[in-house]
Structures are given as structure tokens and as C-alpha cells.
Amino acid sequence: MAKLLLFLLPAILGLLIPRSAVALGTNYLLSGQTLNTDGHLKNGDFDLVMQNDCNLVLYNGNWQSNTANNGRDCKLTLTDYGELVIKNGDGSTVWRSRAKSVKGNYAAVLHPDGRLVVFGPSVFKIDPWVPGLNSLRFRNIPFTDNLLFSGQVLYGDGRLTAKNHQLVMQGDCNLVLYGGKYGWQSNTHGNGEHCFLRLNHKGELIIKDDDFRTIWSSSSSSKQGDYVLILQDDGFAVIYGPAIWETSSKRSIADVGEDDG
């Protein structure tokens, strides 16, 4: 299991991402990707479903788009401006989140506390598919979670995992991304003791040692807010933020009313 601790210190980090097809059962949707009819995003007991009645429902999270029977063959898409849009099979817009920001790469993440949150744009990227100073070969390590939120920490061989890719805060103080063609590392092995990795509230990843001395930083500081580091299925580690929209309705999904934002 990844070792995640909530710290009171602020920090941030951001990454860019390619637009691959989303797989059913994953916990995030990237800009340009589509959740088709009967598609799911899942995280623990929470399940976001683009239902065949055209209603987007977050089960156990008490939220819905209230668009039942408003279309057929509906699809959910995240735009390059961070807006979630449901479109009918004929291409007409059925619902939108109405939360638009600057053009960039965004991620809609099903948070472990049961909220759907849109983060972006991306501010930092680790690329294991190109050669360079930080390259290193792949080796097998056990899998765990793929998300790190602002204020959370990885330490003592804690890791994020996605398919055959793993981002590990090693005990030797080196941050290593295993996978891709070349892998990646922070080149900080032996530079401190009891090191931990933290994502702050300005989109920056920071490695600190036991004395809180900064060992490494992504140097991706942005504006204050909530960010998320996603280890994607394609092997890229990307930081998105700040959060620009989230589900907030507490009423039952059985209730019917106006569109939520």
C-alpha cells in the first residue's frame, strides 16, 4: 500500500498528458477523452456512471446531472477548458458543468472521498519514454494507488502504481518512476535520510529529508489551490490543478431537479 499521510504544510506539482482512450473502471478522465454510455469511473465504493438513460450518476456520492431521459447514446467528455459536457447521440449538448478555465490539459478525478473534481491545467510532467540524465531501467515492484493529492506524502518506499508503471519514493531518498522505455529518477539517492515526497498546494512536488531540508523540487509552483498528481496508465506522471469544479450536491440521486454545477 502507498503510504499517504496528510501534512499541514503547503505544496504543488503538475504534469502534461497524452490523450489515450479511457478504460472502464479507471478513476480519472483526461481532456479529450470520452466516457461512453454505460462507462464507469470508480474509486473504492464510489461509482460514476454515464447511464443509458443519459443521466450521469455518482453512486454513494449523492450526485447526479439530472438529465435522465434527455437523450440516447449519451457521452461525457472533458474539454480542453476544463468543462465537463454530456452530449446526445446526435451531437447536441444535454448538460455541462459550466466551469471553464484557460485552455490546457485537465483531469476529472473521482476523489476517494466521493467527489468528482476537475483539476487543471497541468503544470509539470515526468516522461519515462525519452532518454536523458534521469533514465534508468525498469524493475518489478508491487502495485498500489495512482493518485497523490495536495498535502499528501509518500515515504519509506511508498509508491503510486498504474498498470506496469510505478512511482516510488525510495528509502535511499531517490524518487524513481519505473516503466516506460527509459524510466526516470530524481537523481537524489543518498542525499538524505528518512526522505518523503509531498505535493503542495501550489502544484509543486518536493522531496524533503528528516530535518525538513529540501532535497529536490519539480520547480512547478503555480497559484494556490488543490492539485493532484496522477500516475497515468500511459506511464506519464502529471500534476493537474488547481481544482476548478466539483460535485457538491448532497441530495439523493433519486431526487429530480435543475442541473447541478
Swiss-Prot record:
<dbReference type="GO" id="GO:0005537">
    <property type="term" value="F:D-mannose binding"/>
</dbReference>
<feature type="domain" description="Bulb-type lectin 1">
    <location>
        <begin position="26"/>
        <end position="131"/>
    </location>
</feature>
<dbReference type="InterPro" id="IPR001480">
    <property type="entry name" value="Bulb-type_lectin_dom"/>
</dbReference>
<feature type="short sequence motif" description="Carbohydrate-binding motif 1">
    <location>
        <begin position="51"/>
        <end position="59"/>
    </location>
</feature>
<feature type="disulfide bond">
    <location>
        <begin position="54"/>
        <end position="74"/>
    </location>
</feature>
<feature type="binding site">
    <location>
        <position position="64"/>
    </location>
    <ligand>
        <name>beta-D-mannose</name>
    </ligand>
</feature>
<protein>
    <recommendedName>
        <fullName>Mannose-specific lectin 2</fullName>
    </recommendedName>
</protein>
<feature type="binding site">
    <location>
        <position position="63"/>
    </location>
    <ligand>
        <name>beta-D-mannose</name>
    </ligand>
</feature>
<feature type="binding site">
    <location>
        <position position="59"/>
    </location>
    <ligand>
        <name>beta-D-mannose</name>
    </ligand>
</feature>
<feature type="signal peptide">
    <location>
        <begin position="1"/>
        <end position="23"/>
    </location>
</feature>
<keyword id="KW-1015">Disulfide bond</keyword>
<feature type="binding site">
    <location>
        <begin position="182"/>
        <end position="185"/>
    </location>
    <ligand>
        <name>beta-D-mannose</name>
    </ligand>
</feature>
<feature type="disulfide bond">
    <location>
        <begin position="173"/>
        <end position="195"/>
    </location>
</feature>
<keyword id="KW-0465">Mannose-binding</keyword>
<comment type="function">
    <text>Mannose-specific lectin. Shows agglutinating activity towards erythrocytes from rabbit.</text>
</comment>
<keyword id="KW-0732">Signal</keyword>
<dbReference type="GO" id="GO:0051707">
    <property type="term" value="P:response to other organism"/>
</dbReference>
<feature type="short sequence motif" description="Carbohydrate-binding motif 2">
    <location>
        <begin position="170"/>
        <end position="178"/>
    </location>
</feature>
<comment type="subunit">
    <text>Forms heterotetramer of 2 chains 1 and 2 chains 2 arranged as a dimer of chain 1 and chain 2 heterodimers.</text>
</comment>
<keyword id="KW-0677">Repeat</keyword>
<feature type="domain" description="Bulb-type lectin 2">
    <location>
        <begin position="145"/>
        <end position="252"/>
    </location>
</feature>
<feature type="binding site">
    <location>
        <begin position="51"/>
        <end position="55"/>
    </location>
    <ligand>
        <name>beta-D-mannose</name>
    </ligand>
</feature>
<keyword id="KW-0348">Hemagglutinin</keyword>
<keyword id="KW-0430">Lectin</keyword>
<feature type="binding site">
    <location>
        <position position="178"/>
    </location>
    <ligand>
        <name>beta-D-mannose</name>
    </ligand>
</feature>
<feature type="binding site">
    <location>
        <begin position="170"/>
        <end position="174"/>
    </location>
    <ligand>
        <name>beta-D-mannose</name>
    </ligand>
</feature>
<dbReference type="InterPro" id="IPR036426">
    <property type="entry name" value="Bulb-type_lectin_dom_sf"/>
</dbReference>
